């Protein structure tokens, strides 16, 4: 399955976890001027959405996989991806109460990133009673997300309220219609082996 993908070590590889109907992946690939060197991989567990994307998308630089990204991502070699995108992941992969379940998966994602590769997370916060989300609650949640992923080795590069303006998926478009009760955040994390080594060195020096 993985071996059938035609990208080389010099290729730029972009992966979307849970691509849905593939509209975002397709748009990113179409806007990419490096069709012969950049390769896009979409992973979707829902067979109906996967088949819809497979019928519609015919770009040579896109490969689609039907299955759980939790099972598929570990199959790829380490230091393979330039960018991994997760758009509004299922609560099983981002909810505070389920951190023990999903933290190990994102550590795998980290290992699959090339040095200086990045992981873009777009997720949302809602209230159980569907009340508006206050700034205090929102910023506390964003800080928790940021520090949680940094504890795994990721480096926080950028954070921006909402989803990127040029991103469109069924859920993103729906959530944009209710920004007070559904508050999204886009966090972009990086992987820098040298920076992490320097941080480890400084920590050990401080302990001495």
Residue ranges, per PLM feature:
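Class I SAM-dependent methyltransferase SAM/SAH-binding core
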Residues: 23, 28-63, 70
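A short SAM/SAH-binding and catalytic strip from SAM-dependent methyltransferases
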Residues: 82-100
């Amino acid at each position: 399955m993985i071996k059938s993908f035609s990208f080389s070590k010099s290729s730029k590889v972009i992966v979307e976890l849970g691509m849905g109907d593939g509209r975002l992946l397709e748009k990113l690939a179409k806007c990419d001027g490096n069709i012969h060197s950049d390769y896009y991989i979409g992973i979707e567990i829902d067979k109906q959405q996967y088949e819809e994307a497979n019928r519609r998308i015919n770009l040579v630089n896109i490969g689609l996989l039907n299955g759980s990204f939790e099972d598929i991502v570990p199959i790829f070699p380490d230091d393979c991806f330039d960018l991994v995108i997760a758009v509004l992941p299922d609560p099983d992969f981002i909810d505070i109460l389920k951190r023990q379940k999903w933290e190990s998966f994102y550590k795998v994602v980290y290992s699959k990133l090339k040095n200086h590769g990045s992981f873009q997370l777009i997720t949302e916060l809602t209230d159980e009673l569907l009340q508006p989300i206050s700034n205090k609650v929102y910023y506390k949640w964003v800080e928790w997300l940021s520090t949680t992923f940094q504890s795994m080795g990721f480096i926080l590069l950028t954070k921006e309220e909402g989803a990127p303006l040029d991103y469109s998926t069924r859920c993103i478009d729906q959530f944009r219609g209710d920004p007070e009760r559904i508050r999204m955040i886009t966090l972009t994390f990086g992987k820098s082996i040298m920076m992490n080594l320097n941080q480890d060195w400084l920590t050990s020096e401080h302990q001495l």
